[in-house]
Amino acid sequence: MIKKRLDSRTVRRVLPVAALLAVCMAYASMRGAPALMAAVATRELPVYNVDTEEKVLAISFDAAWGRANTEELMNILDRYDVKTTFFLVGFWAEKYPDLVQELVSRGHEIGNHSATHPHMAQLSAAQIREELRKCSDLVKSITGKPTTLFRPPYGEYNDTVVKVSREEGYECVQWNVDSLDWKNLGTESMVKQCTQSVNPGDIVLFHNDSKYILEALPRILEYYTQAGYKIIPVSQLLLQGETWIDHAGQQHLCTPTPAPQPEGAAAPTA
């Protein structure tokens, strides 16, 4: 059974490994991961993948330029009973409102991919905020629903991009499995990219209008299904509760350290 993973409260920091080890030694008697994290100099990171033992992963599509393939993509996903996340640029949503509505009606999740697809790391905090809000307003005017996930265009970000997006109520999401479909290397290359190393909690990246997506996607879905994976939208993959993000962008639950037991006390039983 797949557990629901919504409304996560993320400790949105990355812990340098050496610093983390030092802190763990210094604070070995203290309880709780958040206390450790607060003591460490950190930087902002998006979520690249999730730490889970469940055989679940998320497929995501970025849509910025054309509508080619999008209807057939939805048909393929329907055939495999798969729901995914589409990160939409504002001008794409404005140009193709029918596709946005159809995506939602078929059960797919919509994420924010900026209003104009700029290089976000080159923008000021105010400009980043404007990009997020314009895209959000456009999507909401079409779907009636707010967006809660953000993916920076080109995968480019800095601390300000991640920080501002989270101040705006978004979880900033990247990917750790890249189909490289934008390189047009062929169907076999895409399939290999997406199947050569698959792990629970992966987030896979595609683009809706890539040249070989219609040929490659069914084979990739077949592979995941036969390997026993359940494919879910990104928001359902994200962990629920207090979380932290490691140096590689993997999201983890904050598991508190067990309280010391009084001397002579019986060990807890399952």
Model-based region annotation:
Residues 35-123, 127, 131, 136-141, ...:
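Active-site beta->alpha N-cap acidic-glycine motif
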Residues 15, 21, 32, 42-46, ...:
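Sparse, context-dependent recognition of short Cys/His-centered cofactor- or disulfide-binding micro-motifs
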Residues 1-59, 75-85, 200-270:
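Terminal accessory/targeting
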